[in-house]
Amino acid sequence: MTYTANDEENKGRSTDNNNHRQMDYNDWLPVTASREAKWYYSAFHNVTAMVGAGVLGLPFAMSQLGWGPGLVAIIMSWAITFYSLWQMVQLHEAVPGKRLDRYPELGQEAFGPKLGYWIVMPQQLLVQIASDIVYNVTGGKSLKKFVELLFPNLEHIRQTYYILGFAALQLVLSQSPDFNSIKIVSLLAALMSFLYSMIASVASIAKGTEHRPSTYGVRGDTVASMVFDAFNGIGTIAFAFAGHSVVLEIQATIPSTPEVPSKKPMWKGVVVAYIIVIICYLFVAISGYWAFGAHVEDDVLISLERPAWLIAAANFMVFIHVIGSYQVFAMIVFDTIESYLVKTLKFTPSTTLRLVARSTYVALICLVAVCIPFFGGLLGFFGGLVFSSTSYFLPCIIWLIMKRPKRFSAHWWCSWVAIVTGISIAILAPIGGMRHIILSARTYKLFS
């Protein structure tokens, strides 16, 4: 078989058309549609993604682990995930002339086009979906608490209706075209997360000065229950460091040049975000456990009742925050769904396609949130099941494959410590989380 000049010309035209179509797709997909983000966008996007519902569960995790193990787990998790996040920022442009804009693309570079995609994509989607389920539950519970504190005569309204109301709001916000279009929502969410963390800390300290436990034991009446609760506590802490699943996608929105690669402004934002994260986490975890001991609720704000106006304000701030967190995590799901629809199924990119796809996702998340509104168990179960992988050990495995650090060097040791820790969490935490869900389900009535 021979090729003519016309064949070569047609082949070149076909390649140009494919490249043009690919470029058009990237201009429409939410992750790559805009690359005009500033360094501080990455700061508040990361705070919004990280300081989510998980921070309110940290005193509960402390009550399951105790003072020493609880603080060690939080600080160690912060250090490990700070390191693994640095690895991901560095790997974003590790291949010359190419930007790895999405977590699955990084996996493909490390493990191969097919294997890499199927190793990373399902785990990333599970993180995004699990986060949105928890945020839907948290948004509904926080709004209910806010309303009941201000209007006690409305206590009869079911939690289900508040979860539905939160989902209705997400239906509207989910039509935002790309990551940068939700920057105001994300900024407001980041601000709220810091404020309600400080309110929870100050209110807990005030409560503790009036009356606090004389001893600080751990939950559980039997050795078995203590062990399972400890597993759940580890998963809850892992859930609090879930932001890695959106890091590359956030970095993809930042412009990059040979003189100023995207990793420089991105890392600047990450450092600011992680300083805010550890301040919020330690303040809330220590003050909440100090004030309530083993009797703290899985959401520390539920344990706080006075002053009513302050706790109402904190719950409303949580509600505002999880609105933004939901969007940050959902944007990656939207990108995956829409990419599949236009690239594989050959749908034409349109507003109608976006409306149908995103609305379907929000509705399904809401359905699960209504059926399984067990905040504490969800944190532990999902935190161990998939968050430990995407935040703790998967970035380190990819780093070892792509960068090949010298054996027994600092990076080699740090990576292996993170890998062993992450795998241990992945094995133990879901056991405790599932047990907590089963115990909660015994007293739960559907659509209550």
UniProtKB/Swiss-Prot annotation:
Residues 63-64, 136-155, 205-222, 291-313, 433-448 are extracellular. PANTHER family: OS05G0424000 PROTEIN-RELATED. One of its GO terms (biological process) is amino acid transport. It is a multi-pass membrane protein. Pfam families: Aa_trans. Belongs to the amino acid/polyamine transporter 2 family. Amino acid/auxin permease (AAAP) (TC 2.A.18.2) subfamily. The keyword Transmembrane helix applies. This is Lysine histidine transporter-like 5. It comes from the Eukaryota. The chain crosses the membrane at residues 42-62, 65-85, 115-135, 156-173, 184-204, 223-243, 270-290, 314-334, 362-382, 383-403, 412-432. Amino acid transporter. GO terms for cellular component: plasma membrane. Residues 1-41, 86-114, 174-183, 244-269, 335-361, 404-411 are cytoplasmic. Keywords: Amino-acid transport, Cell membrane, Membrane, Transmembrane, Transmembrane helix, Transport. It is found in: Cell membrane. It comes from Arabidopsis thaliana.
